[in-house]
């Protein structure tokens, strides 16, 4: 407990003083009489209207059977109109404790042959991305909007009647609602009616959701009921009354003009086997030409004087030194070769001359270019083969 800051210690201070972190209850807080008087002064008429609405809804739910669903909805709408009038007159004070869902959206009556598409941006119960329409239920004797999840999202919206009405006209078979308090006939508000769009069962197609409903898939509902019209009927006449942000146009070609990959890949796959087969045909022909040519044996050139000296003295150097690297052994042999006198070197030069004469007798037409020019000959052969027609065929296959 934090101690008091008084001079008399813990118990010597003023009894009405207390710690700063404790709650100080006021004497006029929670007086039921004042709250009741304030509530009667603030909204006497609204409480009476709410009581009438609650009592009428309870009586209707007990008396009317479940078969007369349309009549119940119409009477519930009639009973809710005074509440809407009060809500329009007092927008700040007329909010319902259950969330006030009826303050923003208009009340719709049942029209046969119409599909109900309310304003998706203003209705609070459609902002969560759910496509299923709300069905009224009673919670604490007050109607509350709750979306239905047990049925298909689009089946409650579409009726099976072939009748069509203009959006701005009032149907003749529906009686006008009568306000019980004012005693005058009222029609549904005109700005709310254009949100109803006629849709025949034959022209119903796959309704594409707007951008806000990308998370939920929408399936075509034409298979759920019988179609009096052929399936090839154009949907443009019935769908033209919808706004453009709800139903996009028919899918056209790709924006970049590039065809779909599924269309291009079969052609590429057809070309690849041809190129592989061409390469397989080229390789055996080249190998066959090599096999047909006679294999000439590799003729070594005759040894010179230094190489004859290395051949003779290499075993002695390896025995004397522990080195096994060929480069180091060659360096030692080179130093010893240069250390020899002219007479000693002349002996190896004479051996080299005899080696050349013997080589010329054995291979009279031999030249050193035959050994060193093999790579150039191979390149020349490849160029000649490409010029003869093998190369252009391969390039044509890749085009």
Curated annotation (Swiss-Prot):
The keyword DNA-binding applies. The modification Phosphothreonine is found at residue 155. It holds the Pfam family HMG_box. GO terms for biological process: anatomical structure regression; apoptotic process involved in blood vessel morphogenesis; B cell proliferation; BMP signaling pathway; branching involved in blood vessel morphogenesis; canonical Wnt signaling pathway; cell chemotaxis; cellular response to cytokine stimulus. The modification Phosphoserine is found at residues 132, 166. GO terms for molecular function: armadillo repeat domain binding; beta-catenin binding; C2H2 zinc finger domain binding; chromatin binding; DNA binding; DNA binding, bending; DNA-binding transcription activator activity, RNA polymerase II-specific; DNA-binding transcription factor activity. It is found in: Nucleus. Residues 1-104, 166-192, 268-298, 369-399 are annotated as: Disordered. Phosphorylated at Thr-155 and/or Ser-166 by NLK. Phosphorylation by NLK at these sites represses LEF1-mediated transcriptional activation of target genes of the canonical Wnt signaling pathway. This is Lymphoid enhancer-binding factor 1. It comes from Homo sapiens (Human). The lineage of its organism: Eukaryota, Metazoa, Chordata, Craniata, Vertebrata.
